[in-house]
């Protein structure tokens, strides 16, 4: 088996975890107490879901997951919620005091007291796996626990599990709305620390998701539950290939192989379609061509940036439901002829396609309509550099005045770490810029240089 262990860190990570596991349970017919009624052998007893669930002797299915937060309130909601019987109490780990939106507390002072306990629990989960594939790490960039503790954990996982893949699902600070003033500091510090430890990071920006909820689902004031359920659908699409048998199956390492051209350029953009409310879906027939086109609308992306200003390096289309390769090929051919999308010249239009016959599941009473087919597009585009540029700019404004820096230094960080992290991100922006430059021009310039 190719098992995956999910680690949910901090408030954002834990709440995304709730949405994801709720959805996984629905998709696999697992009840909130972990039992799987035997009459529900959908698809003739496919056991691929064991990549995400382990089965106990009593026939109970337990998620291969750990929830960690430095303060107890959010995880307490899991302990008392609908799915309290699903998790083993040891999988829910909480500290006493929170990281107070401070990367240094999450990474150094408070984080280091709990890290060994967390690694011990992860080791127990890993021991139950026959062939551990890697880790999915859910966290936010802006919070203290999400930024500081995640980067600490990833450093330690690299030491303990060397070559195992580590994929991140990270909540990127929204351009307009902010949950903490120091978000830019935390984001840049955590990106710098995890850059070499993460194999692939799917970023999700709250504001982009707010807009999708408002525009496509007509929710006036989206709550975190609305946002997380939408994120859950995306995570589910990305992991569906690991949990179900399909025609074209994709495993974790296969994503990286196809999406990450250079180790540092590992921030694919996720787009999901159709995001549509039940009353609208009733009147529309969403064809493969339509949902494929919708993926190339910047409005449906999970991060605010404009791919029309960037170039694509690679593109994965993950379809699920009633989809046949013929329709997919036709839809992609149409998109290629429109040429609104530009690929870098060193990568001839590479679309990787995965099809999973399990139709998308929706949470009963949720906002999303039940549809016959859906698609999640993962594209590695140079446009995401816009997101880094925005963040770097905010960092610079604050750091120029050394605002709030004393909180970090007081927790044992050195000021040098700030400038080091900022330089690393400047380099990352530069990397993205260079990847998008046409290779032929570059050679011409070098030859010109030799003549003088």
From Swiss-Prot:
Entry EC no(s): 3.6.5.-
Subcellular location(s) per record: Cytoplasm, Cytoskeleton
Pfam family, one: Tubulin
Sequence positions that bind GTP: 11, 71, 140, 144-145, 179, 206, 228
Cofactor requirement: Mg(2+)
Enzyme class: hydrolase
Region (Disordered): 432-452
Any one GO molecular-function label of the UniProt entry: structural constituent of cytoskeleton
Active site: residue positions: 254
Catalysed reaction, written as an equation: GTP + H2O = GDP + phosphate + H(+)
Primary location group: cytoplasm
GO annotations of cellular component type: cytoplasm; microtubule
Site label Involved in polymerization, positions: 452
GO biological process: microtubule-based process
Modified positions (N6-acetyllysine) in chain numbering: 40
Post-translational note: Undergoes a tyrosination/detyrosination cycle, the cyclic removal and re-addition of a C-terminal tyrosine residue by the enzymes tubulin tyrosine carboxypeptidase (TTCP) and tubulin tyrosine ligase (TTL), respectively.
Binding site for Mg(2+): 71
Entry keywords, A to Z: Acetylation, Cytoplasm, Cytoskeleton, GTP-binding, Hydrolase, Magnesium, Metal-binding, Microtubule, Nucleotide-binding
Known partners and oligomeric status: Dimer of alpha and beta chains. A typical microtubule is a hollow water-filled tube with an outer diameter of 25 nm and an inner diameter of 15 nM. Alpha-beta heterodimers associate head-to-tail to form protofilaments running lengthwise along the microtubule wall with the beta-tubulin subunit facing the microtubule plus end conferring a structural polarity. Microtubules usually have 13 protofilaments but different protofilament numbers can be found in some organisms and specialized cells.
Role: Tubulin is the major constituent of microtubules, a cylinder consisting of laterally associated linear protofilaments composed of alpha- and beta-tubulin heterodimers. Microtubules grow by the addition of GTP-tubulin dimers to the microtubule end, where a stabilizing cap forms. Below the cap, tubulin dimers are in GDP-bound state, owing to GTPase activity of alpha-tubulin.
Family label: Belongs to the tubulin family.
Protein name listed in UniProt: Tubulin alpha-2/alpha-4 chain
The organism's taxonomic lineage, starting at the top: Eukaryota, Metazoa, Spiralia, Lophotrochozoa, Mollusca
